[in-house]
Amino acid sequence: MAERLSNDFQFIDVGRKDPKKKLLRQRKKEFVEIYEPFKPQQSADQAHRCLGCGNPYCEWKCPVHNFIPNWLKLVAEGNILQAAELSHQTNTLPEVCGRVCPQDRLCEGACTLNDGFGAVTIGSVEKYITDTAFAMGWRPDMSKVKPTGKRVAIIGAGPAGLGCADVLVRGGVTPVVFDKNPEIGGLLTFGIPEFKLEKSVLS
């Protein structure tokens, strides 16, 4: 488990730190995501910078109203699987949003620390949560879902269609997804380049 610093003023002692970019000579040889992944201690240190605001502007600014301070606290404590569970309660594709969502204009832009201390690296921590949880074998718990026997057709296997399918499955409904392309993902697969979003994330 990552060690959590006991200093409640860590946002002063530890500045905002984004993941490092891969070396240029390495980026020239491959067409994959350009940022190195966060290490456990890095993610814990950055998550612990969160002030846990009583009225979290980051959460309000988020289009899906993610429980951002809550899962940042879990990451700071090293509880990655619980953070993944919480993250998936409000977001069907957090592993994608952590990579492509414009956090600088949304959650991070609204962070209380943004003026003066540098916003918490919310997007990078969100990416760390899902990548680490999946690597640990975590999958959403569907054991309590009761099948309804109903089926719903969804036209389009892009992010909206996939998100809709996820919500239906959690409600016990079987989604039947139709798309003109042979692969799922829509814009995620055919529009966003791999240096921003590797296609393996969707598999």
Predicted feature descriptions by range:
Residues 173-189:
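Glycine-rich FAD pyrophosphate-binding loop
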Residues 53, 155, 178-180:
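Generic beta-strand/beta-sheet core signal
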Residues 114, 125, 157, 180-181:
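Fold-independent oxyanion-binding glycine-rich loops
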Residues 120, 191-203:
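N-terminal glycine-rich dinucleotide-binding loop that anchors FAD/FMN and/or NAD(P) in oxidoreductases
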Residues 1-151:
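Ferredoxin-type iron-sulfur electron-transfer modules and their immediate structural context
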Residues 92, 158-159, 183:
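Residue-level detector of alpha-helix initiation sites
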Residues 160-163, 187-188, 193:
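Gly/Ser/Thr-rich beta-alpha loop segments that engage phosphate groups in nucleotides
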Residues 151-176:
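N-terminal Rossmann-like FAD-binding beta1-loop-alpha1 element of flavoenzymes
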